[in-house]
Swiss-Prot record:
Organism the protein comes from: Pisum sativum (Garden pea)
Cofactors that this protein relies on: NAD(+)
Name of the protein this chain belongs to: UDP-glucose 4-epimerase
Lineage: Eukaryota, Viridiplantae, Streptophyta, Embryophyta, Tracheophyta
Pathway: Carbohydrate metabolism; galactose metabolism
Tagged with keyword Isomerase: yes
E.C. code: 5.1.3.2
Gene: GALE
Catalytic activity: UDP-alpha-D-glucose = UDP-alpha-D-galactose
Amino acid sequence: MVASSQKILVTGSAGFIGTHTVVQLLNNGFNVSIIDNFDNSVMEAVERVREVVGSNLSQNLEFTLGDLRNKDDLEKLFSKSKFDAVIHFAGLKAVGESVENPRRYFDNNLVGTINLYEVMAKHNCKKMVFSSSATVYGQPEKIPCVEDFKLQAMNPYGRTKLFLEEIARDIQKAEPEWRIVLLRYFNPVGAHESGKLGEDPRGIPNNLMPYIQQVAVGRLPELNVYGHDYPTRDGSAIRDYIHVMDLADGHIAALRKLFTSENIGCTAYNLGTGRGSSVLEMVAAFEKASGKKIALKLCPRRPGDATEVYASTAKAEKELGWKAKYGVEEMCRDQWNWAKNNPWGYSGKP
């Protein structure tokens, strides 16, 4: 157990992965300070975190409304508290939107993060867990994806993650006292087992499971399946889906590594299950979990979508002592539990 006196700053903490990670941080005895600008999230998510952990642990949680692009917001936060490490989730993540509006992505994802590094350095907080993505592998030439593969990005969102990885490597190389872990997520799905926390995207979902979920509760008429002629077992694309609670535990493992490993430098780890599931397999699993029929519309492939992507998890298992515990069945069970209890997400209304 890590001493509970350690204080962690979590940026973008009201988002899907942020909320679930904050719950696990509190459950593991950390003091947590969170900052979010609610660009793509809501205050209700923070209230639900408090509800899930209970009143005792909630006392170890502080919230600040703020934006990383405003350095004053960060200055105030770091002047008020001494942080032992930062988990940095804040950023925009919709591929399609990034293609249409790349400047918005460069402003949010790059400027915000550069400000964060500057203020961290000024206040001598030099331990960071960074939220990267499997998008940095682009169209991988072979699978599974191993951390030392050549990196490439297929869109502006992916490029921001790639740039930010490179920035992290450059900073750590120039200032070796920094310890940075880059976590490359594959496809986070599922929800907290309580049914009180889950993914609540604004507008039409960009990811498969929230889309399936919205069809199941009647918010959308059908699921668009992009590509049904891939050279896979059922013609649909294959991805590595990982339960969000496994992902949250991966962040705890990464933090422990930062605190215990002096020579971590700047190191990347995949967080996935190491197994691929097709779109149609995920639909079938969700239908089984929910008892609902999901209407499908077969559409052409989207440009830039890879046929099959899944993680090699050997490095995270060996060096972080972390391994995904949940399978597709549990992912769909928990996703449906969240959906049926919150058909309209956190707002509770259309």
